[in-house]
Swiss-Prot record:
Its cofactor is FMN. GO terms for molecular function: dihydroorotate dehydrogenase (quinone) activity. It comes from the Bacteria. It is found in: Cell membrane. Binds 1 FMN per subunit. One of its GO terms (biological process) is 'de novo' pyrimidine nucleobase biosynthetic process. Belongs to the dihydroorotate dehydrogenase family. Type 2 subfamily. Its EC number is 1.3.5.2. It comes from Aliivibrio salmonicida (strain LFI1238) (Vibrio salmonicida (strain LFI1238)). It is a peripheral membrane protein. Monomer. Pfam families: DHO_dh. This is Dihydroorotate dehydrogenase (quinone).
Length: 336
């Protein structure tokens, strides 16, 4: 009820201004009596995935907590894990504004943010300071001005810097808002990236005496042959997990709605069915060889359960959280 009242005011603001205001307030309220508006104690639903113990299988997807500024606040809401980022080697401003749009009637969001972030060094400092007893995943990407043929270098730089502070590392090669990025999902480019990531993981595991899993985040806009090739590469290079899916470029499910023609990736309820189909197909292709983190349109415990029945070991929320608030986490955890 409280969130519904707050949302009415928040949704009168520009979407990005509302996001920035929320982050500022979470930072300001955390640890004060005002955090009662979002703090909630949930039942424990522990699960082990990628060799990591999660206190529950519901996580915050990357993109909302880009710089790791208020990890404790999201932890207080009951998330079993929080994925921060996407972060790049160097700070970057991202794409021109406006770049974030609500499709309220569809409970969707279109973004063309472009990996705006304060850089990997800033993120690492925030993660080091965070007092959160859950799992922190760190989502890494490449800078916009790094040529795509040198993109792997950016991932390796980020991986080296975040490794000892991450519960797991997510490799984002599926954002539609960085030119050329999605080409890394295919053929030799993917194999070269995964090969070098695994080599770096082995080197860092020996250096720090701990094994940090890596998970590949893929797009929903892949046909069956492309999914099959990705699955083969994931197994070939013994990648620890796959995150399905990122946002879509498809607009067929929101045609005619306000903001539907905006460039960028569409998330939320409109991609619920497609992302679940990708999870199901990946499960058929991968079997039990590696776990799947399902994300895309998870806006209720029913939607979360559908992802898990399709084959997801963990699920993440983003757009559903924007529309439903912290109670969404409680509803999913209590009923999953």
């Amino acid at each position: 009820m409280l969130y519904r009242i707050a949302r009415a005011g928040i949704f009168k603001l520009d979407a990005e201004k509302a996001h920035d205001l929320a982050i500022q307030n979470f930072k300001r309220f955390n640890g004060t009596p005002l955090d009662i508006f979002y703090r909630q104690k949930l039942v424990s639903k522990p699960v082990e995935v990628m060799g990591i113990q999660f206190k529950n299988p519901i996580g915050l997807a990357a993109g909302l907590e880009k710089n790791g500024e208020c990890i404790e606040a999201f932890g207080a809401m009951g998330f079993g894990f929080i994925e921060v980022g996407t972060v790049t080697p160097r700070p970057q401003a991202g794409n021109d504004k406006p770049r974030l749009f609500r499709l309220i009637e569809a409970e969707g969001i279109i973004n063309r943010m472009g990996f705006n972030n304060l850089g990997v060094d800033n993120l690492v400092e925030n993660v080091k300071k965070a007092k959160y007893d859950g799992v922190i995943g760190i989502n890494i990407g490449k800078n916009k001005d790094t040529p795509i043929e040198k993109g792997t270098e950016d991932y390796l730089i980020c991986m080296e810097k975040v490794y000892q502070y991450a519960g797991y590392i997510a490799i984002n090669i599926s954002s539609p808002n960085t030119p050329g990025l999605r080409t890394l999902q295919y053929g030799e480019a993917l194999d070269d990236l995964l090969s070098q990531l695994k080599e770096k993981q082995k080197e860092l595991a020996e250096k720090y005496g701990k094994y940090v899993p890596i998970a590949l985040k893929i797009a929903p806009d892949l046909d069956d042959n492309e999914l099959s090739q990705i699955a083969d590469s994931l197994m070939k290079y013994k990648i620890d997990g796959v995150i399905a899916t990122n946002t879509t470029l498809d607009r067929s499910m929101v045609e005619g709605m306000k903001h539907a023609e905006e460039m960028g990736g569409l998330s939320g309820r409109p991609i619920q069915t497609r992302s679940t189909e990708v999870v199901r197909r990946l499960k058929e292709l991968l079997g039990d060889s590696l776990p799947i983190i399902g994300v895309g349109g998870v806006d209720s415990y029913v939607a979360a359960k559908e992802k898990m029945v399709a084959g997801a070991d963990l699920v993440q929320v983003y757009s559903g959280f924007i529309y439903k608030g912290p109670n969404l986490i409680r509803d999913i955890v209590n009923n999953i």
